[in-house]
Amino acid sequence: MNFMLGWNAPPKKAMSLGAILRFPDGRNMPDVHATLFDYGSAPVYLRLNLGCETPEIYRFQGSKGILEVTEFAITYYPQTGEDSAPSYYTSGYPQKMRDAYVAQWHAEHDPVPGKEPVLEGYTYRGDSWDDEKPHLWRYFQGVKNHQQVTEDAVFGNNAALACHMSNESYFRKSAVVWDAASGTIKSA
C-alpha cells in the first residue's frame, strides 16, 4: 500500500483491536486483527484474518468513487457523491416526520422510470499482479549483487513501524503514536 501511494513515512497514530478467536492454541498474537492508521492525509484501515482464504484487496475510496486493486484486476467503481437512498439516520425520527422526509426525498430524487443513471465502471485484468515473488527476487538479487533494491532501508523501516505500532496498540488496548525524537512508540 505504501509503495502504491508513494508514501515513505510511518503512520502518525495507530489503533488496533482483535482477539484469538480461531486458534486458541497458546499463541499471544490475535488471529483476527484490525487496525486504523492515521497517515495525516488519509485514514487507512487494515484487517488481518488468519485461517481463511480471503483475497488480498486494496480499496481506495475517494470523492469520485472506489478503486479496488486485487491480485488479478484493478477496478474503478464510480460514485456520484449524491445519496442514492433516503438517509438511514431517519430511523431515529418520529414516525410522522420520517414519513414526510422519505416522501419528500423520493419526490425530489427518484429518477424517471427508464431514465435511471448508469454509472460505468472499468476493470483491467492481468494474469497476476502478485508482487511477492518479484519483490523477494529483487531483494535477494540486490543483496547478492550489491545493487539498489526498489525501496531503501528507510522505506522498509517505516513499513515495519506500522506493523509494530499495530501490535503495540493491540497489547496496550489503546491508540499509539510514533515519537521520532525518542525513536519509541508511545501511548496516545
State what each model feature region is:
Residues 1-43, 50-53, 154-157:
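Rossmann-like dinucleotide-binding domain that binds NAD(P)(H)
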Residues 2-6, 25-39, 59-151, 176, ...:
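C-terminal glycine/acidic-rich active-site capping loop/insertion
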Residues 44-46, 56-58, 176:
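Short beta-strand segments
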Residues 49-51, 80-81:
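Short, solvent-exposed aromatic-acidic interface loops
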Residues 139, 156, 173:
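Hydrophobic, well-ordered secondary-structure elements that form the walls
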